Amino acid sequence: MPGIVVMGTQWGDEGKGKATDLMSERVDYCVRYSGGNNAGHTVVVGDEKFFMHLLPSGVLNPNSTAVLGNGVVLNLDVLADEIDALRGRGVDIPHPLISANAHLITPYHQTLDKVTERFLGSRRIGTTGRGIGPTYSDKINRMGIRVQDLFDESILRQKVEASLDQKNQILVKIYNRRAIDPGEVADGLLAHAERIRPYVVDVARVLNKGLDEGKVVLFEGAQAHHLDVDFGTYPYVTSSNPIAAGACTGSGVGPTRIDRIVGIAKAYTTRVGEGPFPTELCDDDGERLRSEGGEYGVTTKRPRRCGWFDALVVQQAVMINSVTDLFLTKLDVLTGWERIPVCVGYDIDGERTDIMPVTQSDLHHAKPVYEFLDGWSEDISTARSFDDLPRNCQAYVRRLEELVGTRVSGIGVGAGRDESVVINDLID
């Protein structure tokens, strides 16, 4: 049975939660492998909306075990609140399995994240202020605190004190902030130790054993390809590897265990925060997309920047991630447009290119070259097969397939769990 990666092909907020939830009924393990509570997933079940920041979307399926891999950075307060909130709404979820090697977000990581963004001013990255970047920085600098450290109080306190010896110097002398008490930080972390102890496991062994036994393992990426720290629009990126390859390093399974890679793409494009965005619309069309698409961040509540579908952006992600199937979301938002532009190339200082440029300088100068496709006016929210879609809508999907270089296997035609068109089975 397969290992399946679900990952975003644009700049996040593509609707990965919807696709994951759709597949989760047939999944044994649903794994988050990167990022932290800077991500936001929305799943609509009936009349209820569920917002999750840390737990994988598959947690709403009682037959699927949620897993937080070593590539995730954990805010234990957020994890506890999220679990309690879901249970408070009557969702009977087991506690997720947690990698002993996952790193912990502390209050000083969050403080550093916020004051650094303020200090940068107009040069800011546009982070969520959740402490994600500073936590990954400590991980790379070998100063991080891991989940397993919770179970050795002496080690934990030593690590917190050593880290704050340095960070308090920065906070006090550079940012003019008060020093953070290492004892308070350690006490706050240790308060979670006994609650999570039963769920801390060797995630790599659990997942590999499951795959050996024929279980279905779904790896749910946070953020998206173009926010990847290596392949994204650097420096306007996240601090981890949400690309498909990150599923291996962030959970402990080898690349040969991955059988299918499902890329998620909106039928148009959005972005939150700073960074280049060639097809961005700063006019009434952009406001219409934002309004009709409900484009406000789950985590930050910030209005998302909106623009037309950029085939070069998605094609790049399809290539680097070896995407086998594309799930196209929010196609219904485009209903009612007489003509729909699709970016098929860039004009960079008078030169035409049909692929994403190598340098960020060129991307910042890129002007979109559009192809115009006929729109449709029919309501598509009740479509459940590809043939149910209007002819022009079908033509739009087929043209996107040609441009990005992979097949569209699923389409979101509304916010609800059942408002989807499945063209090709995403698991078998």
UniProtKB/Swiss-Prot annotation:
<dbReference type="InterPro" id="IPR018220">
    <property type="entry name" value="Adenylosuccin_syn_GTP-bd"/>
</dbReference>
<dbReference type="GO" id="GO:0005737">
    <property type="term" value="C:cytoplasm"/>
</dbReference>
<comment type="function">
    <text>Plays an important role in the de novo pathway of purine nucleotide biosynthesis. Catalyzes the first committed step in the biosynthesis of AMP from IMP.</text>
</comment>
<feature type="binding site">
    <location>
        <begin position="298"/>
        <end position="304"/>
    </location>
    <ligand>
        <name>substrate</name>
    </ligand>
</feature>
<feature type="binding site" description="in other chain">
    <location>
        <position position="238"/>
    </location>
    <ligand>
        <name>IMP</name>
    </ligand>
</feature>
<comment type="pathway">
    <text>Purine metabolism; AMP biosynthesis via de novo pathway; AMP from IMP: step 1/2.</text>
</comment>
<feature type="binding site">
    <location>
        <begin position="330"/>
        <end position="332"/>
    </location>
    <ligand>
        <name>GTP</name>
    </ligand>
</feature>
<dbReference type="InterPro" id="IPR001114">
    <property type="entry name" value="Adenylosuccinate_synthetase"/>
</dbReference>
<keyword id="KW-0479">Metal-binding</keyword>
<feature type="binding site">
    <location>
        <position position="142"/>
    </location>
    <ligand>
        <name>IMP</name>
    </ligand>
</feature>
<keyword id="KW-0658">Purine biosynthesis</keyword>
<dbReference type="GO" id="GO:0046040">
    <property type="term" value="P:IMP metabolic process"/>
</dbReference>
<feature type="binding site">
    <location>
        <position position="304"/>
    </location>
    <ligand>
        <name>GTP</name>
    </ligand>
</feature>
<keyword id="KW-0436">Ligase</keyword>
<comment type="subunit">
    <text>Homodimer.</text>
</comment>
<feature type="binding site">
    <location>
        <position position="13"/>
    </location>
    <ligand>
        <name>Mg(2+)</name>
    </ligand>
</feature>
<feature type="active site" description="Proton acceptor">
    <location>
        <position position="13"/>
    </location>
</feature>
<feature type="binding site" description="in other chain">
    <location>
        <begin position="38"/>
        <end position="41"/>
    </location>
    <ligand>
        <name>IMP</name>
    </ligand>
</feature>
<feature type="binding site" description="in other chain">
    <location>
        <begin position="13"/>
        <end position="16"/>
    </location>
    <ligand>
        <name>IMP</name>
    </ligand>
</feature>
<dbReference type="InterPro" id="IPR042111">
    <property type="entry name" value="Adenylosuccinate_synth_dom3"/>
</dbReference>
<dbReference type="GO" id="GO:0005525">
    <property type="term" value="F:GTP binding"/>
</dbReference>
<protein>
    <recommendedName>
        <fullName>Adenylosuccinate synthetase</fullName>
        <ecNumber>6.3.4.4</ecNumber>
    </recommendedName>
</protein>
<feature type="binding site">
    <location>
        <position position="40"/>
    </location>
    <ligand>
        <name>Mg(2+)</name>
    </ligand>
</feature>
<dbReference type="GO" id="GO:0000287">
    <property type="term" value="F:magnesium ion binding"/>
</dbReference>
<dbReference type="InterPro" id="IPR042110">
    <property type="entry name" value="Adenylosuccinate_synth_dom2"/>
</dbReference>
<dbReference type="InterPro" id="IPR042109">
    <property type="entry name" value="Adenylosuccinate_synth_dom1"/>
</dbReference>
<keyword id="KW-0342">GTP-binding</keyword>
<feature type="binding site">
    <location>
        <begin position="40"/>
        <end position="42"/>
    </location>
    <ligand>
        <name>GTP</name>
    </ligand>
</feature>
<feature type="binding site">
    <location>
        <begin position="12"/>
        <end position="18"/>
    </location>
    <ligand>
        <name>GTP</name>
    </ligand>
</feature>
<dbReference type="Pfam" id="PF00709">
    <property type="entry name" value="Adenylsucc_synt"/>
</dbReference>
<feature type="binding site">
    <location>
        <begin position="412"/>
        <end position="414"/>
    </location>
    <ligand>
        <name>GTP</name>
    </ligand>
</feature>
<dbReference type="InterPro" id="IPR033128">
    <property type="entry name" value="Adenylosuccin_syn_Lys_AS"/>
</dbReference>
<feature type="binding site" description="in other chain">
    <location>
        <position position="302"/>
    </location>
    <ligand>
        <name>IMP</name>
    </ligand>
</feature>
<dbReference type="GO" id="GO:0044208">
    <property type="term" value="P:'de novo' AMP biosynthetic process"/>
</dbReference>
<dbReference type="InterPro" id="IPR027417">
    <property type="entry name" value="P-loop_NTPase"/>
</dbReference>
<feature type="binding site" description="in other chain">
    <location>
        <position position="128"/>
    </location>
    <ligand>
        <name>IMP</name>
    </ligand>
</feature>
<dbReference type="GO" id="GO:0004019">
    <property type="term" value="F:adenylosuccinate synthase activity"/>
</dbReference>
<keyword id="KW-0460">Magnesium</keyword>
<keyword id="KW-0547">Nucleotide-binding</keyword>
<keyword id="KW-0963">Cytoplasm</keyword>
<feature type="active site" description="Proton donor">
    <location>
        <position position="41"/>
    </location>
</feature>
<comment type="similarity">
    <text>Belongs to the adenylosuccinate synthetase family.</text>
</comment>
